[in-house]
Amino acid sequence: QRQMCIRDSYSTDTKLGLGLVAAGLYRTDRNDMLLPPSNVSLFGDVSTVGFYMLGIRGTHIFPQDKYRLDYTLYFYSFPSKFWGIGYDMGKVDANESDLDRWQAQVKASFLFRIADNLYVGPMASYDYVHGKNMERPELLEGMNLTTANYGVGLSLAYDSRDVLTNPHKGYYLNITQCFRPKFLGNDYAFSTTDLRTSYYHPVWKGGLLAGELRGTFNFGNPSWAMMALLGNSYSMRGYYEGRYRDKHKIEGQVELRQHVWKRNGVVVWIGAGTVFNKFSALCMGRVLPNYGIGYRWEFKKNVNVRLDYGFGKNGQSGFIFNINEAF
């Protein structure tokens, strides 16, 4: 199954734009109806503020679900904002400064099934970030504007979801450990532990309760561009991506999804998150709230186009237009 649409888009970060979305679901063995469908999404966007992006992501499930290939490839150029590093810098409106950023990422993991719903395998990543026209370079604290980051590691996943792109039931856990040592050519040596877990439970006819917890923990010396960021189209929706950044982050959300009529549905969610440079700095006073509402249109079976409006602390808010559920 393949479909494509061209649509107007708007977000608080990138303003008015024109986007392209193409999505496909397929089975590597058409005779095995118990095999979860693989998925691939091609996405592109260009906006009135000079933002442009092109990328592809997906999961390829091999016959009998013996192996899985997860992949992401994208690049974008964005006249963005930068507040500095740490929670205290991000909360000060006066720290807002302009920064032009060009970024590319290639990331993939190849997983072997070692038991029912349990997978493990190697992963690799490459990130290139080029910053220029920095309005207040002192906010970088002496770090390079341009960095290239090479990483290798291991990924462990438990996945009992019925559908990857739009789960109706099941549990998902992924732990990825990525190492970026100096001998791979990195300017900044550090390692990253990513944790993501989510649960999906039907509550009544057409209603689904979904919950998620995410964490990113950097150990060593990550550059400003590779730190943990709050705010994107998947979590802490409504916050400007990267306004709050530090070595570590923890964030969670609970979302109620309700089918309304034919291809139409709505969601509401609440969440919270924070960034910190060491675990002893964790405190309730630095937890940022998040909540929002959204509309869903079934682009194709088990593939939703979503329009979300998220709210955060001190009047922060933003629109998000994307494909597939946030988690």
For the regions a protein language model found, what residue spans apply to each?
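Sequence/structural signature of outer-membrane beta-barrel proteins
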Residues: 25-29, 43-49, 76-80, 128-133, ...
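Outer-membrane beta-barrel "beta-signal"
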Residues: 153-154, 293-299, 316-327
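Residue-level signature of outer-membrane beta-barrel architecture
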Residues: 10, 24-26, 46, 60-62, ...
